[in-house]
Amino acid sequence: MKVFTIGFTQKNARKFFSLLRDNNVKTVVDIRLNNTSQLAAFAKGEDLKFFLTEFCNIDYIHDTTFAPTEVLLKDYKNKKVSWLDYEKEFNRIMERRNIRSYISKNYANEDSICLLCSEALPNQCHRRLVAEIFKKTLNEVQIIHL
């Protein structure tokens, strides 16, 4: 299984959709807590779903099971917690949600998915953490950051 990750900031629509299409992504899994971002018009939930399905033949799922809690996200954005503390707390949240079992049940039969969040780079984004959990959970997972 290929687990791609992508952030939509610092990408225009052409680059964003071309990366997904050119890498044969089958399903975009939007793991944002809120998918109505004002950062890029093409990345709003219903619009994004329309563009992906109609123009790229890519399925779209908004799955907040992989999202941080509102409190953790707010604390990180307001610099009340460091990235290291965010990462630790996020992983604890995933454990409490039995995320590995959830992945096995809901995503084990996928060929290729792309985890979507807003951050331009994966280094300090929860999509990287989720991709790593996929790799620990399923056999032969290849992580590719777009």
Residue map of PLM features:
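Residues lining hydrophobic/aromatic ligand-binding pockets adjacent to catalytic sites
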Residues: 1-146
